[in-house]
Regions:
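N-terminal low-complexity, acidic/polar interaction/targeting segments
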Residues: 1-174
């Protein structure tokens, strides 16, 4: 791909490349660590690659330790725990970080890294400067995603039961 300035989103992540792995078939896997949210302030060059000056977007101020913040943090931990159970993905390290933090913005960002919802939804989280609102958005997205995952599991169980019943009936007829 050869992205232009028009292909960029207004808010993005400044990230540090930690590792580049060449995979079979000319594929490349890159490990990056996000450092901060930022917006492009000036395009410095477009050829041979896009280069821009960015400005960090700090979190908005919020009152720490309020009952609302505590409730959102607890809800996030519960949602993420159920997500880990339903997806059976290796997210133990992320879960430990969520449990160890009381920063709603940090927790929302951690959850979004592991989330299975779409890119547009992840951008909604990224673009929100207010940490409490960011966690509210993240929790709502996770709650919806959990409903979808539960329904997928239920449909998969029903399908498996139908297959098992069909095989049992076939075996008994033989």
């Amino acid at each position: 791909d050869d992205p232009s300035f028009d292909d960029l989103y207004p808010v993005g992540t400044v990230a540090q490349v930690r590792q580049v792995l060449k995979m079979p078939g000319d594929a490349v896997r890159v490990l990056v660590v996000g450092e901060c949210r930022a917006k492009v302030t000036e395009v410095q060059q477009t050829d041979p690659y896009l280069c821009a000056r960015v400005e960090s977007i700090p979190d908005a101020e919020y009152v720490k330790g309020t009952p609302k913040v505590e409730a959102l943090v607890r809800q996030a931990a519960q949602l993420f725990d159920e997500f880990a159970d339903l997806t059976q993905r290796p997210v133990q390290e992320t879960m430990l970080k969520i449990l160890a933090s009381d920063d709603p913005g940090y927790i929302a960002d951690l959850m979004s890294q592991s989330a299975t919802y779409g890119f547009a939804e992840k951008m909604r989280v990224l673009e929100q400067r207010h940490p409490v609102r960011r966690l509210e958005i993240s929790n709502k997205l996770f709650a919806h995603e959990l409903e979808v995952l539960r329904m997928e599991n239920q449909l998969q169980d029903q399908t498996q039961q139908n297959i098992d019943k069909g095989q049992r009936d076939y075996f008994l007829r033989e």
